[in-house]
Amino acid sequence: MPHLEPLPEAKDQIFDAVDNNWVDVHAPIWSRPFLKLSRMDRPIGTWLLLLPCWWGLLIGILNTGSPKLNDLWIFVGCAVGAVLMRGSGCTWNDINDRKIDAKVARTKLRPIPSGSVSVKKAAFWMVAQALMALFILLTFNTTAIILGFIAILPVAIYPFAKRFTWWPQFFLGIAFNWGVLLAFAASTNFLTWPCIILYLAGISWTLFYDTIYAHQDKEDDALVGVKSTAILLADSTKSWLFISLL
């Protein structure tokens, strides 16, 4: 039987990316570092940002009694906006975490710490994505636009949260579930308590899944001095996660 050598991995392939993802296989080589900054090779995060938007839109439609043509645009606009804002947010995160990422096994091959993209180019890419998302936001009503601008605050704070609190996942939850409020307001032009309660439930959901995700980095995180719920809760994680679902 002939000896078969394993296929070499692309030297810039990110450790936590899916094998043979469309970015590594189909995207033009020049675009790959930028697409990876936006996590286009790992779409699960986009879904985690988009689903709360669609939840908010759904209860907004139920609140008004029937869907309107504008709700279809909100549905589509939220989908495109989730891709763009996740990309812009991840780029912002990587710009600020570049020194930490260089010391963590899972993240050291990301575009900025690996040298594939300069900080200046990453900043331009972040702004470009944010401006495209802004164009979509400005097609919504005034209440949604105001909420969209308020969302900049938790997005801006999140990369620094792991430096000053054991609960950075809470800040991620605030940012990632903001779409519940925004999409509901885009459909109804106001907010209600059921919408706010759903938003709070979404934050709890994010605490659940991102604490699990953080466990893969907890040894490296402890060494470089950053905080997370995975480190804080340690062996008690399962009990706390169960409580978060109640």
For the regions a language model picked out, list residue spans one by one.
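Soluble N-terminal domains of membrane-associated systems
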Residues: 1-6
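Cytosolic, membrane-interface loops and tails of multi-pass inner-membrane proteins
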Residues: 7-32, 90-117, 211-234
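Intramembrane alpha-helical segments
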Residues: 31, 35-36, 88, 107-197
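Membrane-interface helix starts
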Residues: 39-49
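Small-residue-rich segments of transmembrane alpha-helices in multi-pass membrane proteins
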Residues: 47-57, 111, 171-187, 232-235, ...
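Membrane-embedded alpha-helical segments that form the functional core of polytopic membrane enzymes
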Residues: 50-96, 106, 130-137, 145-156, ...
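Multi-pass membrane catalytic core of lipid/isoprenoid biosynthesis enzymes
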Residues: 75-82, 98-148, 223-246
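Aromatic-anchored, glycine/proline-accented short structural segments
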Residues: 184, 191-244
